Amino acid sequence: LQSGVVITNAFIGYRTYGTLNSERNNVIVFPTWYTGNHDQVAPYIGSGKALDPDKYFIVIPDMFTNGASTSPSNAEAPCQGLNFPLVTPFDNVAAQRRLLEDNFEISQVQLMAGFSMSGQQAYHWAALHSDLVLRACSICGTSKTTPHNWAMLAAYKSAFEATTNWQQNCCNAWDPKILKLVASIGATMAM
């Protein structure tokens, strides 16, 4: 990781659509966003859509911490649970590039796209790997986390800490009222 921490046997989950051409350059990458997973990108993929698997080889990598990639819930010791290290957009992009190179020997990415936090990853891709990425599209994403985003995250944290079951930065049973509050915070941010 960017921090220098090594997560033993880290892995990145992903899903692909379409066929990789012989030049290995008909690639679109659309990573998942905060709390998202590859299945949630599926509705945006289809014949005649911008993410058309008849034309492109589409790779949907899952972000670290979403459960389909290395996360606090599935990491090996000593990185399990509350000991899970900080993971940055840079770390996700580095893992995604390795996935593309090691698994598919990609020579070029036609489009690096993303929504929200994966839009932030699209910016990182364009800045760090301009040799590989031809185009980037960030939908509702920022190049860095804004004060508005930090305020939302602080609201989530306050809601989580308000549950009666919160002890030592951990909760094993969520109060339904708290979950409703968290959903309301998320809905407000989506407006």
Which ranges hold each PLM region?
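Short aromatic-glycine motifs in intrinsically disordered, low-complexity regions
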Residues: 1-6
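A short loop-to-beta-strand scaffold at the N-terminal edge of the catalytic core in hydrolase folds
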Residues: 7-19
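Soluble or luminal CAZymes and related metallo-dependent hydrolases
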Residues: 12, 88-92, 174-182
